[in-house]
Amino acid sequence: MNLNQEVIKKVIDYIEKHLDEEMELDNIARHAGYSKFHLNRIFTEETGTTIHKYLQLRRLTIAAEKLAKTDIPVAQIAYEAGYHSQLAFSLAIKKINLYQPKLYRNMGIFAPKQNRMEMAA
């Protein structure tokens, strides 16, 4: 594993540990010891996606699983996923799953869009 991969692993571990918290790229970069621009560049080079997109898709994947497998109210799931409005959450879920949250829930099928990334050793 090269240095960039070690840094990305550290970043992914940090993101996964704090998925349910407010996260700013500045804080993630500070944790990794890099500028946000450099960190985002190497993250994108190593993973093929930006930190923001990874974080967003991980949160939406967890939210989709909650929709499919629990009776937690949609508004609560939206809030837990970092959305301040149910409308914004509904649009984001529909964009990745093609269905509004209530319809997705009624289907009862969970199809993960972004699993946790693992860096090869």
Language model features: what each stretch is:
Residues M1-N4, L91-A121:
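…primarily DNA-binding HTH/wHTH and HhH modules…
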Residues K9-D26, E45-A81, M107-A121:
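Terminal helix-turn-helix DNA-binding modules in bacterial transcription factors
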Residues E22-L55, A78-Q100:
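Basic/polar phosphate-binding segments, predominantly the helix-turn-helix DNA-binding elements
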